[in-house]
Amino acid sequence: MNSFKWGKKIILFCLIVSLMGGIGVSCSFNKIKDSVKQKIDSMGDKGTYGVSASHPLAVEEGMKVLKNGGSAVDAAIVVSYVLGVVELHASGIGGGGGMLIISKDKETFIDYRETTPYFTGNQKPHIGVPGFVAGMEYIHDNYGSLPMGELLQPAINYAEKGFKVDDSLTMRLDLAKPRIYSDKLSIFYPNGEPIETGETLIQTDLARTLKKIQKEGAKGFYEGGVARAISKTAKISLEDIKGYKVEVRKPVKGNYMGYDVYTAPPPFSGVTLLQMLKLAEKKEVYKDVDHTATYMSKMEEISRIAYQDRKKNLGDPNYVNMDPNKMVSDKYISTMKNENGDALSEAEHESTTHFVIIDRDGTVVSSTNTLSNFFGTGKYTAGFFLNNQLQNFGSEGFNSYEPGKRSRTFMAPTVLKKDGETIGIGSPGGNRIPQILTPILDKYTHGKGSLQDIINEYRFTFEKNTAYTEIQLSSEVKNELSRKGLNVKKKVSPAFFGGVQALIKDERDNVITGAGDGRRNGTWKSNK
């Protein structure tokens, strides 16, 4: 299979750098493992730690927390808030997300997705009650160790003092201008045009809101002036905003290629990802990895099967009776194996962000946050954009609109463990997330190469009866896919194909390596 390289940056701690032609660079797993023997920082040899995220400033701030003795959870709160400032188009306090936490003594998933309001009158809103701030507070109060005010400070600094805009944000503002531009967004569109790459973006209103949260906790967001601003802009009642609740769920757990897999429970799509992985294993899809058309068509087949099962059986567990662990059992997968599945049709915006953190104690955080679409609805209040998550509901079935409900999402933060190896991985990409992650893990677990090299390879995804590819396929491959019932279209948008972030800890060598996706400015660092 052909591969392409992106690249612009040189990442610290890499002796040999993998160059990729886009934005962002990460180190090759094999090269760093074999060649880089660095001394641990001033904390001594008490363990290794690392951060993988879609913006270098978020990685830097997360590493500072870990270096100073903070936990993976502490660093995750910092990274989440910083991404909401410096990658504000993909996530933020006006949205929500989910966080998978796997440690030696706990396995938990925190769901802080946006919810539908109860009090809407005759209208059906597009904006859900934001869950991000409540989620961060719950995670801190139950799993964090450092003071919350301290964890908020880096994000406040970047909002108040500013940061250098990268070309990803400039491009996103340019593409979104017809949809979101207004005079209220002059800090993003000085003189009516997107702020240029390299310019400093200062977000005074956001800094003010973050300081209010720092001082008053989540109450400063869900009550008072910020809540009134949300209510006025989003047409959501103050009762709905104040009444937001975080959900704590058990991760879905299964086995794949000898790995124990922990992944996000419904209404997230860890079930779908794990089903696809297990179907790929049972159908021995990897045998055809070097035959492009066959490999693609088999991946499309298992996508159809798993997505159909998702559509029929998954939804908000507060509204739908289901057993997600049963749905990833070997017995259940065997019943799915011979199904055909419907054409892939359920849509979801690709505009999310993912990060992974591993601390000295081996605790892994794999988290995906979102506004749904880039910049959400485009509606802006109190310094942040409001989500458009409610557009992800369907008209009928388990994903139909109901008050207080969370819509289904394709997000699937995941952790895999086997023989002293721990992998934290995930991606943005909307309805393509399981399709993006499955071939990557299929190739990695079969030893095709380093995780970074596999992430660098060109991708393909499917929707309805069309295969979307990053490169132009040969006429021979396209003709073969056509005979299998698939049209082929080249898609020029890198963000369309996700932004996989990952870390791998090898406990035998006490080394952390990682992978970052140049499609979305991805990078990573470790102390060893």
From Swiss-Prot:
Pfam families linked: G_glu_transpept (PF01019)
Disulfide bonds: none
Enzyme class: transferase
Signal sequence annotation: 1-26
PTM field: Cleaved by autocatalysis into a large and a small subunit.
Top-level taxon: Bacteria
Pathway field: Capsule biogenesis; capsule polysaccharide biosynthesis
Keywords attached to this entry: Capsule biogenesis/degradation, Hydrolase, Plasmid, Protease, Signal, Transferase, Virulence, Zymogen
Positions that bind poly-gamma-D-glutamate: T352, G429, G430, N431, R432, R520
UniProt induction comment: Capsule synthesis is transcriptionally regulated by AtxA, AcpA and AcpB.
Catalytic residues, chain numbering: T352 (nucleophile)
Gene Ontology BP annotations: capsule polysaccharide biosynthetic process; proteolysis
EC number(s) given by UniProt: 2.3.2.-
Example GO molecular function: peptidase activity
Similarity annotation: Belongs to the gamma-glutamyltransferase family.
Task performed by this protein: Transpeptidase that cleaves the poly-gamma-D-glutamate capsule and catalyzes the formation of an amide bond with the side-chain amino group of meso-diaminopimelic acid (m-DAP) in the peptidoglycan scaffold. Degradation of the high-molecular weight capsule (H-capsule) to the lower-molecular weight capsule (L-capsule), which is released from the bacterial cell surface. The production of L-capsule is essential to mediate escape from host defenses.
Subunit structure, interactors included: This enzyme consists of two polypeptide chains, which are synthesized in precursor form from a single polypeptide.
Protein name stated in the entry: Capsule biosynthesis protein CapD proenzyme
